[in-house]
Amino acid sequence: MKPTFPAIVTTAEMQAIEGAMFNGGLPIPALMEKVGQRLSHYLQAHFPTSQYPRVAVLAGPGHNGGDALVVARELWHRGYQVKLWQPFERLKPLTADHARYARFLGLPFVERVEALQEVDVIVDGLFGFGLERELTGELAHAIDEINTWPQPRVSIDVPSGLHSDTGAVLGTAIRADRTLCLGLWKRGLLVEEAQPWVGQGVLIPFDIPSVVIETALASAPRRYCLDDSCWQALPLSRSPITHKYQQGQLLLIGGSGQFGGSILLSALAARCTGVGMLVVAVPQSLKSLVLSRVPDAIVVGCPETPRGAIARLPEGLELGKFSAIACGPGLTPEAVSVVATVLRAETSLVLDADALNILATLSPWPLPSGTILTPHYGEFRRLFPDLVGTAGDRLDQVIAAARWSNAIVLLKGARTAIASARGDLWINPHSTPALARGGSGDVLTGLIGGLLAQQEALRATYGGVWWHAQAALEAEQQATSLGVYPEQLIAHLLPTLRRALAARV
């Protein structure tokens, strides 16, 4: 089954989508009421009145403020002690109606933001998507003060003060612990630099017709947010009469005297994918180590340089017989001939770590279709120096790099981005800084390599990224962010998959 992912939109695209719905007959008040109800249901579920009885709602002058006022009203009806702060004289008509009704119900409005200091949770509805001007003066000062308070802050759609396309801070912005994004993901929420203000992103759908989305985005490159649909990308269905040679053959190449553990981590991760045959090519001196830890693999010892890197691949190793080759973990920059040989192989490739650094010196562009590059931003800058600083932000840069190189480019980071050669983009909104340690990328390379040996490149890429991140999140729950070392991460791969599949039944 082909996964379907929620779209990521710009401000102009979201305005076109909402405009089409309104032109089709949906009353604006009806949409505001629906959105407010869904927001209040989320808040009641995650901030119950037993633990968070006192709620502050910051209401702006526009429809984001109207949504906030509906939330305030609904929480008030459900027994929460609500205080409203709306520091604006001029309101949009619909927002003014909701403010008037809130006063009629007796909800208390406070004049000064300091009056909110004793609440248990803060709901930010000052500004939504489309804000362009910088926040200054007393409003900016109030936001800065709110950011110093210890209570959890929940923003409606976009943290107030954050640009919804670029993720830039417009003077100042609410530092949200959670952002409840309405309808479709806004591009700016997924920019890596915006994450300290976005916190945990949660999509709150409000039933946008798929035909409206398709029409509005028909001429634009597609941008998607990964979600649980990624589990459908894994090669879980097998014929009852299959055999190992029909389940993919993966060649892993890497390791050195300096980085002996990297290729071992990749191999341990790769075998979790169920790949039929796993062959690992390492320096001769590492062969016994890898074989002792991965006895089900065929381990090929390679001639070494004096410093313990692979000098060349051995004669008789037929690269064309493999379904996929993953090259790079622990390789070292000495292995130029290895990468040059791999690039001539007529099979699917994953290139990581020093294979990328060597690739930057070889410049064999464009790459064979379906090649997967997995750089972090430092490696990306070495690979594509002409794009850095000239092609917009990182999301624009990764799209430009994929188009130029003819590869799938996976830019690792707090919000890992995947771009295809046709210019489509996928972003993983869920990850953890617990992965910021040596070896995490080696695990990802093994995962993607094992999946690539069994299926097409794009599915292998986003399936591997999602699986890797979800296993890390689960490991973090048990071991804290300090305990998600690579072997712990690998140990959680199959239990995470099993629980995800059980939840789908």
Swiss-Prot record:
Q: Which residues are noted in the entry as (6S)-NADPHX 1-binding? A: D157
Protein name per UniProt: Bifunctional NAD(P)H-hydrate repair enzyme Nnr
Region annotation (NADPHX 1) maps to 63-67, 128-134
Q: Where is this region: NADPHX 2?
A: 376-382
Q: Does ATP-binding count among this protein's keywords?
A: yes
**Which residue spans adopt a coiled-coil conformation according to this UniProt entry?**
none
Q: What is its EC number?
A: 4.2.1.136, 5.1.99.6
Please give the organism.
Answer: Thermosynechococcus vestitus (strain NIES-2133 / IAM M-273 / BP-1)
Give the Gene Ontology MF terms in alphabetical order.
ADP-dependent NAD(P)H-hydrate dehydratase activity; ATP binding; metal ion binding; NAD(P)HX epimerase activity
Q: Which cofactor does it need?
A: K(+)
Q: Where is this region: NAD(P)H-hydrate epimerase?
A: 1-219
Where does the YjeF N-terminal domain start and stop, copy by copy? 14-214
PANTHER family noted in UniProt: ATP-DEPENDENT (S)-NAD(P)H-HYDRATE DEHYDRATASE, ATP-DEPENDENT (S)-NAD(P)H-HYDRATE DEHYDRATASE FAMILY MEMBER
Source taxonomy: Bacteria, Bacillati, Cyanobacteriota, Cyanophyceae, Acaryochloridales
UniProt domain YjeF C-terminal: residue ranges? 226-500
Cofactor, free-text remark: Binds 1 potassium ion per subunit.
Task: Return the similarity comment.
Answer: In the N-terminal section; belongs to the NnrE/AIBP family.
InterPro entries given in the database record: Carbohydrate_kinase_pred_CS, CARKD, Nnr, Ribokinase-like, YjeF_N_dom, YjeF_N_dom_sf
| Record-linked HAMAP family | NADHX_dehydratase, NADHX_epimerase
Matches recorded under CDD domains: YXKO-related
